[in-house]
Curated annotation (Swiss-Prot):
GO cellular component, one term: cytosolic large ribosomal subunit
Record SUPFAM superfamilies: Ribosomal protein L14
Record function comment: Binds to 23S rRNA. Forms part of two intersubunit bridges in the 70S ribosome.
UniProt family annotation: Belongs to the universal ribosomal protein uL14 family.
UniProt source species: Borrelia turicatae (strain 91E135)
Protein name: Large ribosomal subunit protein uL14
């Protein structure tokens, strides 16, 4: 579960390192985001000389959450951190690589490009 003011790891090679959720998109009163939901982030830390700068605002998709995800077969999946992948205006990933595992729920949310860039899908 990611809500406003949650800090997330940026799991791609755009140059951002840490981001803060400033809005959860979808619905008028939606308070928390799960894996596959789109959020608006503010970049809090960035790598020097990268295209993403500190203070910039972007859309991102949540790829990992510390809060467990319940699946239809009764199993639960959780990760060590909250992570996101920065998106462009067409909701495609801005980076060319995705670091770490991502949840299989991204397939259901139609983020196939993120799934194909990921090294591991759990």
């Amino acid at each position: 579960m990611v809500q406003m003011q949650t800090y997330l790891t940026v799991a791609d090679n755009t140059g951002g390192k840490i981001a803060e959720c400033i809005k959860v998109l979808g619905g008028s009163k939606k308070r928390s985001a799960r894996v596959g939901d789109i959020i608006v982030i503010a970049v809090k830390q960035a790598i020097p000389n990268s295209p993403i700068k500190k203070g910039e605002v972007h859309k991102a998709v949540v790829v990992r959450t510390s809060k467990e995800i319940r699946r239809k077969n009764g199993t639960y999946v959780r990760f060590d951190d909250n992570a996101c992948v920065i998106l462009d205006a067409n909701l495609n990933p801005r980076g060319k690589r995705v670091f770490g595992p991502v949840a299989r729920e991204l397939r259901d949310a139609n983020f196939m490009k993120v799934v194909s860039l990921a090294s591991e899908v759990i």
